[in-house]
UniProtKB/Swiss-Prot annotation:
Protein name: Probable WRKY transcription factor 49
Matching PROSITE patterns: WRKY (PS50811)
Entry's family note: Belongs to the WRKY group II-c family.
Polar residues composition-biased segments: 216-228
PANTHER family xref list: WRKY TRANSCRIPTION FACTOR 49-RELATED (PTHR31221:SF42), WRKY TRANSCRIPTION FACTOR PROTEIN 1-RELATED (PTHR31221)
Lineage: superkingdom: Eukaryota
Tagged with keyword Metal-binding: no
InterPro entries: WRKY_dom (IPR003657), WRKY_dom_sf (IPR036576), WRKY_plant (IPR044810)
SUPFAM superfamilies: WRKY DNA-binding domain (SSF118290)
Keywords annotated in UniProt: Coiled coil, DNA-binding, Nucleus, Transcription, Transcription regulation
GO cellular component: nucleus
Chief location bin: nucleus
């Protein structure tokens, strides 16, 4: 049989190798015993078709896929039912564990310490078996849904129990939006120096003016000054007119006024008369 195969390959050459379906391949050369051939391979057409299909396409057939789906499909329904029932529970558990946490914070002398965010109070509620009410706050940032609940502890009066819900989607305000009223420390010191100098000057001038006014008032109200004012010379000056005023005036009034009315007493005449 080996010699016949060698002769067949010699006669056919490379064409038998390139196109095995034109010439009968050597794989189908069976022994000459027909009984043995029929015993081993009862259906030549089935084997040939199987060989051809195996050489053309080696992947799964449609019937194989249909059989596989028929076997697997009944098991998918309970899995889907379980997934629908368990997903909401998983989501709730993750939300309750991750998005909600509680802290205990001690207040200082200025009140409750600031956490860096701005909050708006939107409600208050009394709690059962607790004298301290619970306050509800919400973040003022419009893109943020964070909330918190503040409650004073029953055991410690200087401790707050804060429960946060959700997360902040922005930075804290002292670093993200600085206050407009705040200024840099160097500028503040310079401004304070100038203001202090101006205030010192104004205060000094005001004090000097007040001291001068007080000094004048004390000098006027001093008993020595009052005694000097009440001397006879000062009293005479108040009673009598000065000599210059008593001199006759040159003009037309001399022709009208009588001479007797011109004799106005003066200090010199009084002294001489006395």
């Amino acid at each position: 049989m080996e010699e016949e195969g060698y002769q067949w390959a010699r006669r056919c050459g490379n064409n038998a190798v390139e196109d095995p379906f034109v010439y009968e391949p050597p794989l189908f050369f069976l022994p000459q015993d027909q009984h043995h051939m029929h015993g081993l391979m009862p259906n030549e057409d089935f084997i040939a078709n199987k060989f051809v299909t195996s050489t053309l396409y080696s992947g799964p057939r449609i019937q194989d896929i249909a059989n596989a789906l028929a076997l697997v499909e009944p098991l998918t329904h309970p899995v889907r039912e379980i997934s629908k029932s368990t997903v909401p529970l998983l989501e709730r558990s993750t939300l309750s564990k991750v998005d909600r946490y509680t802290l205990k914070v001690k207040n200082n002398s200025n009140g409750m310490c600031d956490d860096g965010y701005k909050w708006r109070k939107y409600g208050q509620k009394s709690i059962k078996n607790s004298p301290n009410p619970r306050s509800y706050y919400k973040c003022t940032n419009p893109i943020c849904n964070a909330k918190k609940q503040v409650e004073r502890s029953i055991d410690e009066s200087n401790t707050y129990i804060i429960t946060y819900e959700g997360f902040h989607f922005h930075y804290t305000y002292p670093f993200f939006l600085p206050d407009k009223t705040r200024q840099w420390p160097n500028k503040k010191t310079k401004i304070h120096k100038h203001n202090a100098q101006d205030m010192n000057k104004k205060s000094q001038t005001q004090e000097e003016s007040k001291e001068a006014q007080l000094g004048e008032l004390t000098n006027q109200n001093h008993p020595v000054n009052k005694a000097q004012e009440n001397t006879p010379a000062n009293l005479e000056e108040g009673l009598f007119f000065p000599v210059d005023q008593c001199r006759p005036q040159q003009g037309l009034l001399e022709d009208v006024v009588a001479p007797a009315m011109k004799n106005i007493p003066t200090r010199d005449s009084v002294l001489t008369a006395s």
